[in-house]
Amino acid sequence: MIPLQHGLILAAILFVLGLTGLIIRRNLLFMLIGLEVMINAAALAFVVVGSYWGQPDGQVMFILAISLAAAEASIGLALLLQLYRRRQNLNIDTVSEMRG
């Protein structure tokens, strides 16, 4: 069994990597990928803590997080596809120009 601290440190590192990708990147696709990494890091933390306590609640939260991430990814990718068709670019700066 993996110690609680190791699992939580791994989840924290993944969360920080996703947050860094979300903040630094200007491409919306990479921002969406960073958000997915953050969601998976939080889900990993739920699984690790649930395993440590011997409760299935962490796995239930993981299933919920994965289903929400799938819905978020499908809607986000559909919006990105429409944006790319209109602007031929996925840069975040072009989205702010769409206001009018």
Swiss-Prot record:
Catalytic activity: a quinone + NADH + 5 H(+)(in) = a quinol + NAD(+) + 4 H(+)(out)
InterPro entries: NADH_UbQ_OxRdtase_chain4L/K, NUOK/Mnh_C1-like
Gene3D superfamilies listed in its UniProt record: 1.10.287.3510
Compartment(s) where it occurs, according to its Swiss-Prot or TrEMBL record: Cell inner membrane
Organism: Photorhabdus laumondii subsp. laumondii (strain DSM 15139 / CIP 105565 / TT01) (Photorhabdus luminescens subsp. laumondii)
GO MF annotation list: NADH:ubiquinone reductase (non-electrogenic) activity; quinone binding
Residues forming coiled coils: none
Function: NDH-1 shuttles electrons from NADH, via FMN and iron-sulfur (Fe-S) centers, to quinones in the respiratory chain. The immediate electron acceptor for the enzyme in this species is believed to be ubiquinone. Couples the redox reaction to proton translocation (for every two electrons transferred, four hydrogen ions are translocated across the cytoplasmic membrane), and thus conserves the redox energy in a proton gradient.
Assembly and oligomerization: NDH-1 is composed of 13 different subunits. Subunits NuoA, H, J, K, L, M, N constitute the membrane sector of the complex.
Annotated EC: 7.1.1.-
Keyword presence, Ribonucleoprotein: no
UniProt main location, coarse: membrane
Keywords: Cell inner membrane, Cell membrane, Membrane, NAD, Quinone, Translocase, Transmembrane, Transmembrane helix, Transport, Ubiquinone
Gene name, Swiss-Prot/TrEMBL: nuoK
Domain of life: Bacteria
Protein's membrane topology: Multi-pass membrane protein
Annotated transmembrane regions: 4-24, 29-49, 60-80
Protein's name according to its UniProt entry: NADH-quinone oxidoreductase subunit K
Gene Ontology CC: one annotated term: NADH dehydrogenase complex
